[in-house]
Regions:
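Class I S-adenosyl-L-methionine
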Residues: 1-129
Length: 129
């Protein structure tokens, strides 16, 4: 983060769960079947204090997996409520109004291809038939 000019502030832990709410043990990992993923939260510039909702927000979110590398939309609402921005998602898939999106699939033409995960989020991106 520092190399990109950001100051690390905290992390958000995404606990990947199945439809029944139990841990999704299909994660990858050589030593463990990882059911969590860390999202790093950083800022640029001075006087970028977290908004009041962020000071009472726990850093754990339980949500179902989506297609490879795509984060749950639930994180967007959480970050929007806790930070004034501007906002950036690195290694993103798709685009999002009010955010800068960086990644080789970070544009409006991106569409999920894994129908398995079509119902796993509050996503606004529609799946093709």
């Amino acid at each position: 983060m520092k190399a990109w000019g950001f100051e690390y502030k905290s992390n958000l832990v995404w606990e990947k769960v199945r439809k029944d709410g139990l841990p999704d043990g299909r994660g990858v990992g050589f030593y463990f079947r990882n059911v969590t993923e860390l999202l790093l939260f950083g800022i640029k510039g001075k006087n970028n204090r977290t908004l009041a909702p962020g000071r009472s927000q726990v850093n754990l979110l339980r949500a179902m997996k989506r297609e490879h590398s795509r984060k749950p939309d639930e994180f967007v609402a959480l970050i929007d409520a806790c930070s004034t921005g501007p906002k950036l998602e690195m290694f993103a898939r798709g685009d999002r109004e009010g955010w800068d999106m960086w990644g080789n699939q970070a544009d409006e033409s991106y569409e999920p291809t894994w129908k398995t995960y079509a119902n796993h989020t509050v996503a606004t991106v529609k799946m093709s038939a």
